[in-house]
């Protein structure tokens, strides 16, 4: 299924974004409405709507682990001394874009 979200459009370069990191599996870009001094969105290029849609399998765990490690790698590359990582799950959990993503934020 083609990713219909704004993140899919960024991945396909149909919309501009301030990209801070990209590899074969992930892309990270600055949030257009930052809530911290540093506010980066890290998402897999594979379209997965929510965290709850990851399979409860070793492969799903590996994909989630890579997502978290990618966010950590970006924080290190940016020289962040302190940060937090947040994932909203579902509409009731505050998720606005239905393509799983990590908020990497810091005011440090």
Where are these regions (language model features)?
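HIT superfamily nucleotide-processing domains
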Residues: 1-108
């Amino acid at each position: 299924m083609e990713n219909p979200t704004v993140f899919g459009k960024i991945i396909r370069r149909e919309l501009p974004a301030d990209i801070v990191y990209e590899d074969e599996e992930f892309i990270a870009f600055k949030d257009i409405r930052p809530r911290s001094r540093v506010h980066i969105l890290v998402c897999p290029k594979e379209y997965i709507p929510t965290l709850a849609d990851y399979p409860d399998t070793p492969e799903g765990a590996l994909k989630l682990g890579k997502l978290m490690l990618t966010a950590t790698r970006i924080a290190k590359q940016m020289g962040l001394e302190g940060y937090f990582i947040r994932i909203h799950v579902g509409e009731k959990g505050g998720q606005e874009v239905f393509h799983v993503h990590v908020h990497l934020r810091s005011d440090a």
